[in-house]
């Protein structure tokens, strides 16, 4: 590891993660025209954001930076894979890793893995259906479309908010921060699907101001403690999302992790670490029994 990378990793442990994220969140929600227009224009240039596919192309039309960052796309901008039974990629970005869940652990980077149960909030019962299953981790870069969509149609069973740190998420931290994704703040969404249980985990990171879901809105319990929300109780109307429907969004980016049970899916042979992906592409197909 280079000296520059060592300094960067050291800074990750020293910086006040949540304070920085709150301050940046305030700036991202600022509606002052002189500020938000300059910030949006700088960001679009810096990260070469393609506005031609956005529903709103005019950078000055957004009420604040977060509205720009979570911008909707034009109809048809992300066609859904048509292969029978296709499991869709949930987001734009790049595959960080994908593969089997072995011995209750998920591969993070060379020399690093993390606990499946810890990712899901330390609940062994929640983790049990995914033991021996498969995972895919998708990293969303700053220039990407930042809404997350359903890989399969599913009925929401449970949502778990898991408090944690807000380490930056990139290749350097993945290779040098142990159990990165099981330490960062995250929202676990559990669904029943035609391929059995499926989890979509939205992982926060440094300067990620917030995580939202379409059914709960902003997910930030006031005391930042682990909190479980059940949606399969008789008193609640079922929440069902169709394949390709929006599930949630990041206000300033990070990572989506998808989990499946054993012998349910076979990942697209063309995908591997660092493969660029777009929401709606074929991530996997049903595994043949």
UniProtKB/Swiss-Prot annotation:
Site-annotated residues for Cleavage (non-hydrolytic): 253-254
Catalytic residues in the record: 92 (charge relay system), 149 (charge relay system), 254 (charge relay system), 254 (schiff-base intermediate with substrate)
Q: Which InterPro entries match?
A: PS_Dcarbxylase (IPR003817), PSD-B (IPR033177), PSD_type1_pro (IPR033178)
The cofactor note from the UniProt entry for this protein is:
Binds 1 pyruvoyl group covalently per subunit.
Pathway involvement of the protein, from the record: Phospholipid metabolism; phosphatidylethanolamine biosynthesis; phosphatidylethanolamine from CDP-diacylglycerol: step 2/2
According to its UniProt record, this protein's enzyme class is: lyase
Keywords assigned: Cell membrane, Decarboxylase, Lipid biosynthesis, Lipid metabolism, Lyase, Membrane, Phospholipid biosynthesis, Phospholipid metabolism, Pyruvate, Zymogen
The Gene Ontology biological process terms listed for this entry are: phosphatidylethanolamine biosynthetic process
Q: Which residues form a coiled coil?
A: none
Q: Could you say which EC number(s) this protein's record lists?
A: 4.1.1.65
Cofactor(s) recorded in Swiss-Prot or TrEMBL: pyruvate
Q: Name one GO molecular function term.
A: phosphatidylserine decarboxylase activity
Q: How is it modified after translation?
A: Is synthesized initially as an inactive proenzyme. Formation of the active enzyme involves a self-maturation process in which the active site pyruvoyl group is generated from an internal serine residue via an autocatalytic post-translational modification. Two non-identical subunits are generated from the proenzyme in this reaction, and the pyruvate is formed at the N-terminus of the alpha chain, which is derived from the carboxyl end of the proenzyme.
Q: How does it sit in the membrane?
A: Peripheral membrane protein
Which compartments does it reside in? Cell membrane
Q: Which residues carry this modification: Pyruvic acid (Ser)?
A: 254
Describe its partners and assembly state: Heterodimer of a large membrane-associated beta subunit and a small pyruvoyl-containing alpha subunit.
Identify its protein family. Belongs to the phosphatidylserine decarboxylase family. PSD-B subfamily. Prokaryotic type I sub-subfamily.
What NCBIfam families has UniProt attached to this entry? PS_decarb
Job description of the protein = Catalyzes the formation of phosphatidylethanolamine (PtdEtn) from phosphatidylserine (PtdSer).
* Stated name of the protein: Phosphatidylserine decarboxylase proenzyme
